[in-house]
């Protein structure tokens, strides 16, 4: 029994505008949002999960705890990705990376950070264009998600962890301490689909270290939970 990562949800003031930006950057396709309240993008590669842009009036108050690392096969590709993102409405963003950084830090039109990684990066060499979801988090939360998704650890050193689906796609990484304090609800969150009995799966996740949120189940029977670091995610039947 397990859960499947089916979507990364992104809160947006203007879901359609933000979806158009990411269509242009990633080359993904618009797709039906089966839950009806957002705009979905479907991957055209082995990423394995959709993006869901959900309407929200909440303001962004801090750096996101998760961001995309986009890969490059050549310096020219890195330059092209950056230029395309800027033309679509992105901007350069300073997170303290310094002038010698070989990756480029950008933000989308609503301020969500992402990186365009330099060519020759060995850690992401086997990954596609979406190389990683790079996250702020503990070693324990990396272990939790490895067990929850049944994805193997592909990195576990100096309190940094990374997992990757056996079917390929991006890595999900957690950088270890120091941690950025969590303020409010995360703008980026996972949607999981239960394979089999949803209540049994909820119990399994709780046994691994998750907790149920205080809110009641949603209209489709979905249940919001938090991982050991307090990050919200939703389990759908």
Show the residue positions of the predicted features.
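Glyoxalase I/VOC metalloenzyme domain signal
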Residues: 1-34, 41-94, 107-158, 163-216, ...
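Short, small/polar residue-rich loop motifs at catalytic or cofactor-binding pockets
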Residues: 99-101, 218-220
């Amino acid at each position: 029994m397990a859960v499947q990562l089916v979507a990364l949800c992104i809160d947006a003031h203007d879901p359609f505008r933000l979806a158009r930006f990411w269509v242009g950057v990633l080359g993904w396709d618009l797709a039906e949002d089966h839950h009806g309240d957002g705009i979905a993008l479907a991957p055209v590669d082995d990423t394995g999960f959709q993006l869901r842009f959900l309407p929200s009036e909440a303001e962004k108050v801090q750096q996101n705890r998760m961001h995309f690392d986009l890969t490059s096969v050549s310096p020219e590709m890195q330059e092209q990705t950056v230029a395309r993102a800027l033309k679509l409405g992105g901007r350069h963003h300073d997170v303290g990376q310094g002038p010698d950084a070989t990756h480029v830090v950008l933000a989308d039109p609503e301020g969500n950070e992402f990186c365009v990684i330099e060519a020759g990066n060995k850690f992401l060499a086997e990954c596609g264009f979406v190389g990683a979801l790079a996250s702020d988090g503990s070693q324990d939360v990396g272990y939790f998600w490895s067990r929850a998704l049944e994805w193997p650890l592909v990195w576990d050193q100096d309190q940094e962890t990374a997992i990757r689906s056996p079917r390929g796609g991006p890595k999900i990484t957690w950088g270890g301490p120091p941690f950025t304090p969590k303020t409010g609800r995360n703008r980026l969150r996972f949607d999981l689909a239960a394979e089999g009995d949803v209540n049994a799966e909820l119990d399994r996740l709780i046994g691994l270290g998750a907790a149920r949120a205080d809110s009641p189940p949603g209209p489709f029977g979905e249940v919001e939970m938090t991982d050991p670091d307090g990050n919200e995610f939703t389990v759908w039947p």
